[in-house]
Amino acid sequence: MPEIDVENRKETDIWKFETTPRMSSYLLAFVAGDLQGVTATTKNGTLVGVYSTKAHPLSNLEFSLDIAVRSIEFYEDYYGVKYPIPQSLHIALPDFSAGAMENWGLVTYREVYLVVDENSTFASRQQVALVIAHELAHQWFGNLVTMKWWDDLWLNESFANMMEYVCVDAIEPSWNI
């Protein structure tokens, strides 16, 4: 959730954030570090940001930012439901065992699935787009609407698996996904 106040103290600072909507505890995430990022706003006003360590130039985050913004806009139009919270932040983590995790409003990724440079192949760009679209699909299937118990996790994953292709095909039709 967006930061609403920072109290600067002598040895430590205190950050206050907007109250989150009700959510499953497994969707909660915090990230702290010396990060840099790029941001944009969707046509409906959602702040979208892509962040990494300073080991990567900011230009390596632009592709992912563009895909994230267009994916959110696609899903809002497709579902007829606005993105449910005020921001969508995407963080490239240098040592992350999972491929990505759809924490609500703070999606975490292995660096290879978010950082794109001038040497990235077309196939790797497609893979990055699919992973971003997959994680953003979970913001509706799995986060906004959460299954009652883990037995039904397959529903979250199957919807996200299908929708990543529907989304990327819609926002990048020349790719013939």
Feature roles, as predicted:
Residues 1-133, 162, 174:
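Hydrophobic helix-coil surface modules that form long, contiguous segments used
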Residues 61-65, 149-157:
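Active-site metal-coordination segments of metallo-dependent hydrolases
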Residues 134-135, 157:
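Acidic active-site catalytic centers that drive phospho-/nucleotidyl reactions
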Residues 136-151, 166, 170-171:
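Catalytic Zn2+-binding segment of zinc metalloproteases
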